[in-house]
């Protein structure tokens, strides 16, 4: 019985930690992406929690599912048109979190190399100034 319990607990830990990334006080939570077709673009959304006493910077991202990955900020201009601007640095203050969400910051997956269907998962590596690279698992979901 103890072997079954230990195996179950180990499996549970693996499942929980595969859904988020954590390195040196930086936790990446709730990562998801929109469905998309090969050749189109998609976006990744997530929350980054900086548990350290120093500010951190997200400086890049990459994934094998797309030709490129860029950090973008969506915003509404004075004419009411949505625009996107590439971001070279996103600051996560010490002991704080930022959310990459629809209509704001996000990771743009440029030119998908394959279809992304609801339920699929794929890795994305986030590049941080201090923590280095953190690879997370992203689930494809329909936006609410």
Give the label of every model feature segment.
Residues 1-8:
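Bacterial N-terminal signal peptides that target proteins for export
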Residues 23-144:
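Compact, glycine-rich, soluble single-domain proteins
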Residues 16-19:
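C-terminal motif of bacterial Sec signal peptides marking the signal peptidase cleavage site
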Residues 10-13:
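Residue-level signal for mature regions of secreted extracellular proteins and peptides
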């Amino acid at each position: 019985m103890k072997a079954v319990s230990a195996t179950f607990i180990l499996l549970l830990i693996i499942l929980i930690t595969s859904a988020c990334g954590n390195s040196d006080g930086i936790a990446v939570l709730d990562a998801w992406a929109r469905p998309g077709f090969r050749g189109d673009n998609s976006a990744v959304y997530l929350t980054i929690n900086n548990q350290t006493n120093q500010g951190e910077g997200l400086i890049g991202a990459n994934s094998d599912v797309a030709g490129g990955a860029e950090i973008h900020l969506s915003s509404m201009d004075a004419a009411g048109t949505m625009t996107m601007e590439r971001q070279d640095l996103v600051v996560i203050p010490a002991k704080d979190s930022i959310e990459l969400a629809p209509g704001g910051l996000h990771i743009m997956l440029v030119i998908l190399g394959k279809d992304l269907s609801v339920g699929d998962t794929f890795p994305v590596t986030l590049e941080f100034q201090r923590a280095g690279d953190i690879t997370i698992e992203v689930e494809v979901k329909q936006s609410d």
